[in-house]
Curated annotation (Swiss-Prot):
Designated name of the protein: Isoleucine--tRNA ligase
Principal localisation: cytoplasm
Cofactor info, note text: Binds 1 zinc ion per subunit.
Organism classification: Bacteria, Bacillati, Bacillota, Bacilli, Lactobacillales
Domain notes for this protein: IleRS has two distinct active sites: one for aminoacylation and one for editing. The misactivated valine is translocated from the active site to the editing site, which sterically excludes the correctly activated isoleucine. The single editing site contains two valyl binding pockets, one specific for each substrate (Val-AMP or Val-tRNA(Ile)).
Amino acid sequence: MKLKDTLNLGKTEFPMRAGLPTKEPVWQKEWEYAKLYQRRQELNQGKPHFTLHDGPPYANGNIHVGHAMNKISKDIIVRSKSMSGFYAPFIPGWDTHGLPIEQVLSKQGVKRKEMDLVEYLKLCREYALSQVDKQREDFKRLGVSGDWENPYVTLTPDYEAAQIRVFGEMANKGYIYRGAKPVYWSWSSESALAEAEIEYHDLVSTSLYYANKVKDGKGVLDTDTYIVVWTTTPFTITASRGLTVGADIDYVLVQPAGEARKFVVAAELLTSLSEKFGWADVQVLETYRGQELNHIVTEHPWDTAVEELVILGDHVTTDSGTGIVHTAPGFGEDDYNVGIANNLEVAVTVDERGIMMKNAGPEFEGQFYEKVVPTVIEKLGNLLLAQEEISHSYPFDWRTKKPIIWRAVPQWFASVSKFRQEILDEIEKVKFHSEWGKVRLYNMIRDRGDWVISRQRAWGVPLPIFYAEDGTAIMVAETIEHVAQLFEEHGSSIWWERDAKDLLPEGFTHPGSPNGEFKKETDIMDVWFDSGSSWNGVVVNRPELTYPADLYLEGSDQYRGWFNSSLITSVANHGVAPYKQILSQGFALDGKGEKMSKSLGNTIAPSDVEKQFGAEILRLWVTSVDSSNDVRISMDILSQVSETYRKIRNTLRFLIANTSDFNPAQDTVAYDELRSVDKYMTIRFNQLVKTIRDAYADFEFLTIYKALVNFINVDLSAFYLDFAKDVVYIEGAKSLERRQMQTVFYDILVKITKLLTPILPHTAEEIWSYLEFETEDFVQLSELPEVQTFANQEEILDTWAAFMDFRGQAQKALEEARNAKVIGKSLEAHLTVYPNEVVKTLLEAVNSNVAQLLIVSELTIAEGPAPEAALSFEDVAFTVERATGEVCDRCRRIDPTTAERSYQAVICDHCASIVEENFAEAVAEGFEEK
């Protein structure tokens, strides 16, 4: 037997190298085979419910790192709730209707307008479901636990029926109406858009300054006067029916030198406009208040059949332009509102594809709206005073990335204005984890217009509306519920397969259809109405979930999207918000803080991370960032996270190895019998348990990450485990001191594994497989550790906090000695301490082998004053010299008792007593040489 064999060197087959890319799929198959998700739900039956309702990602393409961050975050929350006494099922979902899928089919050569609509919709459905299958595997590979075999998908008959019922309740309450208000119109999609489908980009436009000649000045202006107008959308002049001024804005009548014409502009803008128009020696003839100009009539710049009326509007400012705006009620919301109030014609001169129509005039007909500027300039002639290119923020279609226009077309609307205050009242009851989120959602609802819910597309849920022979729209409870039942049985494609009369209840009549003939609506619903109905299609309809949901968690862009549409439909139906809490996340940016895009080549695919690092590293990264704001990710950042993971793993490996001979049922030492340092570590770890449990409850992942890493690096590695080898390796295998420390090791190991499970489930299960005395098959079926309280807890913490200060001072003294070449390693040191009474009392209270805690071979507590050469602090001073004696071959301490023993071992007296007591046979035979 060799001397080293008398050491209790930790033994374990738990590998240092994780091998996550290959091991994770193996664990996941095992979980699936063992039906872990179902078993966890069965365990928690009857416990308080917690419903995190999954916002549905769009079923198109591979998942990106933003998807991964979102689903991992949800998984951490659901797992932690399941391990904290809650029944927390997770039903993943997908959003499957809408334009992107139509665009994919178009790129594949499918021509929608040349094939049977039902066949086309079948292709859309097949493609959407193929994407659901693909993304489902992507999410499962991240280790996300949920009811993957029974997700919700917005194209299923049961979901579509639930959506129709949401619409029906809104219709019954009078919230649905048809109007021709201007809406966001995407010529590139040939459809109306909702606010949530708009994004803003900078756009360079041609702006024109031109003049309208006064036709009837109403006794205020002469007919040789011109009112100066500014526009950034020249094509809309073809539909201009008025000029709007601000009632309280001052306007001036001016005549520039050498100009026969007189002009009206805002007084505040005269100087800048004179410079722009090249006017010199401008004479101000008169000043008017805007309201004095009301109802003056002007000529249209070129259309002699049109008169333009001067009207008043609150939206007019003097921030730019001329203080006077031309008004085309068919092409703008403000224009529409003031136009309707003044009985102006709502003219629309652009068709659904962005092409100028016949009513725009023969010179414009057939041109694309953006290309008409030269024609407009030609038609204006000498009425054009100036033109310039301006860059401004402009709305774009978020899918096609093309600019949109405002365009008045008949659409179906949800009248948010009718129940706006109810919605705002409900927002006040929701808990927002970001206060700015509440303000943002509140302001959006407060300021938003009515919701355009109709779309002129094919792939979506039909609006369940019929038309009588006289054109009356029919949407009554009887017909809508009948449609819902048809959809529930056959799916929404039946709407296109049957005639209108075959979609109505048997025997249905309507006074507007004396001949019994009906037509059906051909528009579909906005996809935000699809996902915005999920509270009914899923949360209400799935018995395992509770409504309202406890939590909605999505990206911050969903304040105008899913958070918004879900809130509107839920309040409209039931008067309550669909969620009790909202947690929002920022966007994932690259390592430089730039937005990720394929064109820049700076995207990171979750699959690439899984291949290089493993999903665990991506999961750990999610906890390492403040996801309430935008976050950065790169392979370099993930490499740093991987290093942190390695530190966590190897620390826990040390605990596994050094409890391999520990049976908790037989070897555990009661808390009251632990040494002071072991009690301190038990209490410190219990503080970590509380911090992490509280952070899980508040969804504060970064708090968990910081607390965990700090505990492992500072409390364990830099302190407790730093001197642990002197105990667990050297003391007798069954000695009290070793069992005391193993008791703490095992307690930390088991509980920290449970605490890690929501974040690192693969690693936690791997560790659990080495803990033979734990009863649960899988750690995921266990509970998070409870927070404990201990006698004299605060007193012990105070004592050891003071000792840590003392230890830091001692380490400075040892470092100085090392720099002066007095010692090499700290075990070569004889440390002399010159304490005052406070420190002396402290060291007595610590009641431990202080030399062992400081990892020095010899320690002396001196009486009297410290020598001048000592390193002094306020309460204590130190001197360091080389310890006397020889190095013990077993414990590596320098000890004056070290000597060669009769059994061929050069060891100290302490080690000799251990060896002689525990290895009598080897002592009798003598040890082999090294």
